[in-house]
């Protein structure tokens, strides 16, 4: 397992397409603004670049409204890339496009195929293991396929349960650094983060990016 999993040299992003407003939704909160999405995406890329990352921005895919969620279709590791097998039928075609766009960046490539299904939003890579939450988008066969590939690179994969009603495992958690996880109480109470410091509470701060005021949320252990 590579140390320093929270430190990255390169970030891969994809521009939201105009059809992104028609993307899948776990909860219907109204029609999003594509102009706001594009502005937020630009700010996101700017922050990554300011932190020293080489930001690769892939072109929008009009046929796939959810394609800007790039982590769901490709798990990028120092040893290579594993192309995922999305659990939502409308996202199947994203994988081929992602493979065309980024496969050349990696020395080794693998792909998971149906009936195994797994999405990157259910995968949390820590400094000691890879946690995968089963969900409506990730099944046991998908976890098994990932486990076989990752084992060849020295990674241990552990399966955990995503709480009912939660789209992805990482909807309820995120890695703050190699030893600290920001999590909801309902997920942390399952015991899946044993051995980690857990942040439950949040505070907010404001910063200006490109002259606009933005709000940021941080977790406190």
Residue ranges and their predicted role:
Residues 1-221:
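The feature marks the mature, well-folded catalytic cores of soluble enzymes
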């Amino acid at each position: 397992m590579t140390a320093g999993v929270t430190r990255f040299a390169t970030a891969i992003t994809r521009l939201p397409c105009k059809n992104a407003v028609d993307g899948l939704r776990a909860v219907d909160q109204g029609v999003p603004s594509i102009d706001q999405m594009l502005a937020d995406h630009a700010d996101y890329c700017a922050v990554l670049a300011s932190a020293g990352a080489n930001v690769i921005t892939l072109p929008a895919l009009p046929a796939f409204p959810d394609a800007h969620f790039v982590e769901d279709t490709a798990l990028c590791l120092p040893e290579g890339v594993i192309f995922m097998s999305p659990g939502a039928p409308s996202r199947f075609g994203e994988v081929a496009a992602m493979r065309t766009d980024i496969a050349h960046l990696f020395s080794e490539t693998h792909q998971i195929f149906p009936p195994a299904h797994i999405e990157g939003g259910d995968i949390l890579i820590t400094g000691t293991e890879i946690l995968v939450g089963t969900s409506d988008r990730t099944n046991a066969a998908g976890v098994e396929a990932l486990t076989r590939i990752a084992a060849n690179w020295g990674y241990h994969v552990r399966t955990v349960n995503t709480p009912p009603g939660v789209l992805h495992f990482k909807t309820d958690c995120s890695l703050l650094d190699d030893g600290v996880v920001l999590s909801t109480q309902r997920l942390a109470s399952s015991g899946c983060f044993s051995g980690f410091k857990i942040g439950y509470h949040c505070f907010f701060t404001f910063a200006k990016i490109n002259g606009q005021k933005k709000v940021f949320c941080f977790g406190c252990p």
